[in-house]
Amino acid sequence: ELCGDMVNVIRKPDETILVLADGMGSGVKANILATLTSKIISTLMSGDADIDECVETISETLPVCSVRGIAYSTFTIVRVKHNGEIYTAEFDGPEFVMLRDGVLEEPEKEMRVISGKEIWESHFTAKPGDMIISFSDGVIHAGIGRLINLGWKRVNVMEFIQRNYRPHISARVMTKDLVSVCDHLYEGEPGDDTTVAAVHIMPRTTTRVMVGPASSPDM
């Protein structure tokens, strides 16, 4: 069955845009909703559109479910300017988790209603080493009705992320560790699509490569 979550990343010379979307329902319908949402938002934002235009476009574009009569996908946007400015926007999904020097941070957020949707936005300046971890609700549903009656709540996810942090841990390792725990809580049989995406703020590094003639004239 197709995954109902989708992550899209666009890299530009001066910024990186990450969008995680979770389509309503499951299978093909959810996949279509999540794919359209992530693609539309990332493409528009890479062209300097604001969140208002993105949400309005999604509302006019997403196919309406014939059963529920609505078109719906949650999303989390993380926009990283290469000067350190961060913009995030969240709609109806689990809130992202942020680490700074291994300590949990909660950036100040403001809510705006755009096209009938409550969008939570934040603006802040990142520091080297900051990590922003976003995830679909499959993470906080992990273990529900199995190892954990009420699922793995966000506070539990935050505690795990902080315990798992160590200096120089990569975004790839952090996301892999988080997904592995979810798989364990689901006992290898996920009850919901589970997706984790992380952004790790790192200073730009320069690599120099020296190339010379072969040691043997025959080469």
Regions found by a protein language model. Name each.
Residues 3, 31-102, 119-120, 169-204:
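Catalytic core of PPM/PP2C metal-dependent serine/threonine phosphatase domains
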Residues 75, 84, 95-126, 132, ...:
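Small-residue (GG/TT-enriched) beta-loop-alpha framework at ligand/catalytic clefts
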Residues 200-219:
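Regulatory/sensor and coupling segments of signal-transduction and defense proteins
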Residues 22-23, 93, 131-139, 193:
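DG-centered beta-turn motif at the end of beta-strands
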Residues 1-13, 106-145:
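Acidic loop->beta-strand submotif enriched in PP2C/PPM serine/threonine phosphatases
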Residues 8-19, 26-32:
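N-terminal glycine-rich anion-binding loops that anchor highly charged ligand groups
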Residues 13-17, 128-131, 192, 206:
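Short hydrophobic/glycine-rich mini-motifs in sensory/regulatory modules
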Residues 26-47, 132-182:
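Active-site-proximal, acidic helix/loop segment immediately C-terminal to a metal-coordinating Asp/Glu
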